Each structure stands twice: as C-alpha cells, then as structure tokens.
UniProtKB/Swiss-Prot annotation:
EC number(s) from the headed UniProt entry: 3.1.-.-
Alphabetized GO MF terms: magnesium ion binding; RNA nuclease activity
Organism, as annotated: Mycobacterium tuberculosis (strain ATCC 25618 / H37Rv)
Binding site for Mg(2+): D5, D112
Names of the cofactor(s): Mg(2+)
InterPro entries (UniProt xref): Mtu_PIN, PIN-like_dom_sf, PIN_dom, VapC_family
Residue span, PINc domain: 3-142
Designated name of the protein: Ribonuclease VapC41
Key word Magnesium present: yes
HAMAP family on file: VapC_Nob1 (MF_00265)
Amino acid sequence: MLLCDTNIWLALALSGHVHHRASRAWLDTINAPGVIHFCRATQQSLLRLLTNRTVLGAYGSPPLTNREAWAAYAAFLDDDRIVLAGAEPDGLEAQWRAFAVRQSPAPKVWMDAYLAAFALTGGFELVTTDTAFTQYGGIELRLLAK
C-alpha cells in the first residue's frame, strides 16, 4: 500500500510543477487497483493548496474555486488505483507524538510527523519528494527525484 505526500498530489495536479514528470512516471508504474492512498490530511492539504492564489500563481494559474478543487480531487478518485484511506491506523497518535516531539518549536514538523506515523502504523510506503522524511526511522520511504 502506498501513501502519497501532498507534494506528490500537487505535482500530479499541476503539469508545470517541477516534480510533475517524475510523479507521473511513477504513477504510470502502478497497475493494481486501490493501492495508492490519500489520507484525510493529504486530502485537505491538496484542496487548500489548489485554492491558494500564491501557490497556483507560481504556475501561472489562478486558484481553483472550492468546487473546482473538489472536482480535481474527485478526478484522482476516478482512477481505480487511488482511494481515500479509511480510519486512522491503530497506534497512530502515539507514534505521531513520538515523531513530533522536539526540544524547540518546530511548526513544520507536525504534518511530516503525522504522515510518517500514518505510514508506519498503517503499513504504507510513503511516496514523496521531501528528503526531510528520512529523519523518521522505521518508515518505508520512496523518494521521487526531479
């Protein structure tokens, strides 16, 4: 089972994204149905980013309306390889806490720690372009290059 980081979903959604080709090439290697997962956090992140003027402006596009963002998300789910993960895995919160604890404020750690914990406790391979995930021991990680 595969859990994609938001950066993969965004790269797949935006043809001008620096990681679009690598993400598309990876996606094209997957044939089995129902093996690529959104979790609720990556779903929300994608919807938020697709409606963000600054993010889409960097690609020369206006932000999507909320309706259009939902349609873009639904288009992913029309692909039988892609599904929304159901309930959070058992033990997720304890593992998330273990990954997120730091001695100083680290606001950027929350989402990465959550996704790493989701992957670890749910038995997912985490697919991302973000090398920061290498800090989380025990997770199965697939880093896609440019």
